[in-house]
């Protein structure tokens, strides 16, 4: 159950108010001329404290973690994606990409006509799960911190849902950007 649902339930039933999740902003302090490329990419990125990259990141790390009010997380975080991640990449109408992901989505009843809906739905679920801390840390390197977020969509050709992992990059100030709309089951 998300924090907001727990808060609402506590208010309705007169229960103890739950503690807000602790979010942190990674701050890279420039205390020397040597800078870790990974720490530079993490600068001002937001993470749930219990689901953040290891800190300190290395033996000579000058970074600090600053508190962020959960209200700021709820109101300022955003999930974005390029339409091109869905059309032409995901649905691959000209067979430019060897991934065959379009066959999987076609088997669930989706076509390129659904690309905009999928983009909106994946952004919506990605944002909701990110602010709830429901993400898995992935690779961290000079490109930045990757996270995986599981989403669920209805099959268009059956009365059931399908769940899969989406891949994202974390950027400063609560922004996550879709790297791949389908990263695996």
Language-model region placement:
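Domain-core detector
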Residues: 1-60, 64-123, 127
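Functional cores of ribonucleases/endoribonucleases
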Residues: 20-31, 35-41, 119-185
């Amino acid at each position: 159950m998300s924090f907001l649902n727990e808060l609402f339930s506590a208010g309705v039933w007169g229960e103890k108010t739950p503690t807000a999740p602790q979010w942190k902003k990674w701050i890279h302090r420039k205390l020397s001329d040597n800078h870790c490329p990974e720490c530079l990419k993490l600068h001002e990125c937001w993470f749930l404290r219990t689901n953040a990259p290891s800190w300190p990141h290395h033996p000579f790390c000058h970074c600090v973690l600053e508190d962020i009010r959960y209200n700021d997380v709820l109101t300022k975080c955003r999930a974005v994606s390029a339409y091109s991640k869905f059309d032409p990449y995901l649905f691959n109408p000209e067979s430019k990409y060897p991934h065959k992901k379009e066959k999987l989505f076609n088997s669930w009843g989706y076509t390129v006509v659904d690309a905009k809906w999928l983009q909106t739905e994946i952004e919506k679920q990605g944002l909701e799960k990110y602010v709830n801390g429901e993400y898995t840390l992935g690779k961290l390197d000079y490109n930045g911190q990757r996270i995986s977020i599981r989403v669920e969509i209805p099959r268009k050709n059956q009365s059931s849902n399908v769940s899969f992992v989406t891949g994202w990059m974390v950027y400063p100030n609560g922004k996550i950007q879709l790297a791949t709309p389908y990263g695996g089951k």
